Amino acid sequence: MQLDYKSIDFNTKWILSGSSSIIYRETLNSTLSIALDKQRQINDKGKVVITDHQTSGKGTHGKQWISTAYKDLTFSIILGNENSFGQKLIDECCLAMVHVLSLYDLKANIKYPNDIYINNKKIVGILLSNIQSQGENKPYQALSIGMNVNSEIDIKSIDEKAKVNSTSIFLELGKEIKREELLKLIIQNIDPAIQKQGYL
């Protein structure tokens, strides 16, 4: 089912709120293709780029993030270039994701530097991306998150190159959850981390 993004109001401080805070595309090769666009970085800082069907998601070290269309969450937050975010932001976001999962009675742990696991199976990946623009002192940045939410398959079953097993909230709980509610929780818990690191 398509994400009902128009019903979501994040009610956040750094990340934008309201109906215009989400840049939604039903299908994208990667949310980073929009989030790292210079004009988007200048005009849409604080907005969330999200898609229901990401065909070529980006992971660390050039790896691909695989998600199930209309089942999972794949999004990027446009950070602009006013701050120089680094690993500390990822660390804070990992802690936030562990907390969000605990609200669903799921015990998760952090696998440094940027992944979240449940029972030794990956459920969340976090990526901080930079793009340097000519004549700019600081790079433009975007924070991307992929979470296995309602998918019903282990990534290793469809990608023979995958080195780890994966899981999802559905596989752990045995039931689907509303992605809109989960997205709002994630954004509300990540927002303080961006505020904190942005002022360091």
Regions found by a protein language model. Give the residues of each.
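Short beta-strand-initiation
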Residues: 44, 60, 111, 121-123
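A secondary-structure boundary/capping signal
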Residues: 51-52, 112, 145
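Long, positively charged amphipathic alpha-helical accessory segments at protein N-termini or as interdomain linkers
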Residues: 2, 82-108, 118-200
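Active-site proximal loop and beta-alpha junction motif in alpha/beta enzyme cores
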Residues: 22-24, 112, 148
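N-terminal lobe of the biotin/lipoate ligase/transferase fold
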Residues: 1-106, 176-177
